[in-house]
């Protein structure tokens, strides 16, 4: 029961902090990045129907100040992905499905001793860039992340 009350307080405090952020200027994109309710909801929920594990939420809540700091100081992004997704939109008082391009940018850094990735999202050509997610230190094993050549001199294991 005590863990639940601590979780509730942490979530409430984080939500207040997140809401008070509003937007921050990003040198990497040379524009403001907005911290909308969609981004906070994505920290709590994986999708519309499933909540993230509590331990994952707590870690993301605690890393949020680092994510904001990273957006403020990073001058480059390391990842980019563009997809097309369907969204429900209102058109002449009716709900219709509309396909829009969705762009994701990943800013990766070790900041204050923690490796994190901040994901910025933009929907459509006219959408505003907004915070989408924070990914704590992770392990990659996807094909696109395979290292084909090294740019490092020497052996990092031995040096």
PLM region spans:
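Ribonuclease/tRNase effector modules and their secretory precursors
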Residues: 1-159
């Amino acid at each position: 029961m005590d863990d639940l009350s601590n979780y509730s307080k942490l979530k409430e405090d984080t939500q207040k902090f997140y809401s008070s952020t509003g937007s921050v200027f990003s040198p990497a994109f040379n524009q403001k990045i907005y911290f909308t309710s969609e981004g906070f909801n994505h920290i709590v929920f994986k999708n519309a129907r499933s909540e993230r594990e509590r331990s994952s939420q707590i870690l993301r809540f605690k890393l949020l100040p680092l994510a904001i700091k990273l957006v403020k100081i990073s001058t480059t992004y390391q990842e980019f992905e563009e997809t097309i997704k369907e969204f429900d939109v209102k058109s002449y008082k009716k709900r219709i499905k509309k396909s829009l391009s969705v762009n994701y940018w990943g800013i990766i850094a070790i900041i204050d001793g923690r490796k994190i990735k901040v994901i910025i999202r933009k929907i459509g050509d006219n959408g505003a860039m907004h915070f989408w997610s924070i990914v704590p230190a992770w392990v990659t094993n996807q094909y696109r992340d395979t290292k084909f050549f090294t740019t490092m001199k020497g052996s990092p294991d031995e040096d």
